[in-house]
């Protein structure tokens, strides 16, 4: 549970009013193994400047990275798409499984019950980030806010409460993979060189929202100026980037395949692919290997998180799902194993 909370604090769903900022993709593609490229966009590979020097230490130094050709989901994986996977395979997500008594002997049966992290909100600026979240028994991708909630009307929303192994299981069912951090960032930049945001260098404009993020002082109040107040949006509600990809900024955090280390590798053109598990390191929790998550979420505000930029990166524990964490997949051309798998 501590790992899950660490993931939540990386970037801070409670029920709230919602209005649509603009038309969304009416019917996102629901893929299956018979249509391996359905709902994906082909991205031609190349060399790009990965990372940033001016924002946060873990994002630099900028380096030249080469990525090959690949296909990537046009949108985040939706509830409808994940439901098809579960129906076909009988898969049970980590949030739906109880903790084992052998691994957690000091916890009671109730404390080991299936649960996940849900954003609780805050009526004031609490100095304790742990108060912003609740471990909710029964919360999972099927019930995003816990018992009593469901997916009715949310078929096109991004699936959440997904741990890294859940995302990998879905990807492998389709013969796909999770993107490396370099592939994800290359795709998010959409062909722009060195831009601060996925849409360019211009600061976010509340009159023409480009992404689902938090408007206002987090966690006290979200004005909902972007059309969605303190919650995820259906996929494709905001303009696509230069490669035709939606929601590469905000909405929900997205898993990558890479293990996390603060900072990037030394300069020089290198091939995409992150460090091995043995090299993973999070200074905040040494000894607990984590994966890189990218893109920020609907909880990212300028006063807290501010990670809805393509260079931004933060660690996520593999067993940590929450109400603001989802994913998308890639299909490489040709497919190949990535170091560190």
Annotate each PLM feature.
Residues 18-23, 42-43, 49, 54, ...:
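Functional-site microenvironments in short loops/helix caps that host divalent-cation chemistry
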Residues 281-285, 314-321:
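Short proline/glycine-enriched turn/loop segments at secondary-structure junctions
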Residues 323-337:
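Short, structured beta-strand segments at or near domain termini in extracellular proteins/domains
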Residues 70, 85-94, 174:
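Short capping motifs at secondary-structure boundaries
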Residues 10-11:
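C-terminal motif of bacterial Sec signal peptides marking the signal peptidase cleavage site
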Residues 17-34:
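N-terminal pre-domain segments of enzymes
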Residues 74, 79-86, 163-169, 185:
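Short, solvent-exposed alpha-helical surface patches in non-cytosolic proteins
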């Amino acid at each position: 549970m501590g790992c899950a909370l660490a993931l939540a604090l990386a970037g801070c769903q409670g029920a709230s009013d919602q209005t649509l900022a603009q038309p969304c993709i009416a019917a996102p593609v629901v893929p299956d193994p018979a249509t391996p490229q359905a709902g994906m966009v082909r991205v031609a590979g190349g060399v790009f400047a990965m990372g940033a020097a001016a924002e946060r230490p873990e994002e630099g130094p900028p380096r030249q990275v080469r990525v090959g050709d690949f296909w990537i989901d046009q949108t985040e994986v939706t509830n409808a798409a994940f439901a098809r996977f579960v129906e076909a395979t009988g898969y049970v997500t980590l949030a739906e499984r109880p903790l084992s008594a052998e691994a957690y002997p000091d916890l009671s049966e109730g404390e080991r019950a299936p649960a996940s992290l849900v954003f609780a909100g805050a009526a004031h600026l609490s100095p304790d980030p742990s108060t912003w979240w609740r471990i909710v028994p029964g919360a999972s991708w099927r019930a995003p806010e816990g018992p009593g909630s469901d997916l009715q009307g949310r078929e096109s929303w991004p699936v959440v409460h997904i741990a890294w192994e859940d995302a990998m299981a879905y990807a492998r069912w389709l013969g796909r993979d999770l993107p490396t951090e370099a592939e994800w960032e290359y795709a998010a930049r959409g062909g722009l060189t060195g831009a601060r945001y996925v849409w360019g260098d211009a600061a976010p404009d509340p009159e023409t929202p480009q992404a689902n993020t938090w408007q206002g002082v987090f966690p006290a109040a979200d004005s909902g100026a972007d059309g969605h107040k303190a919650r995820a949006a259906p996929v494709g509600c905001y303009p696509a980037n230069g490669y035709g990809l939606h929601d590469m900024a905000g909405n929900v955090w997205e898993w990558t395949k890479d293990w996390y280390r603060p900072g990037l590798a030394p300069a020089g053109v290198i091939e995409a692919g992150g460090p091995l598990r043995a090299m993973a390191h999070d200074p905040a929790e040494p000894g607990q290997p984590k994966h890189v998550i990218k893109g920020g979420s609907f909880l990212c505000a300028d006063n807290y998180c501010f990670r809805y930029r393509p260079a931004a990166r933060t660690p996520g524990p593999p067993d940590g799902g929450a109400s603001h964490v989802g994913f998308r997949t890639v299909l490489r051309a040709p497919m190949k194993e990535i170091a560190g798998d």
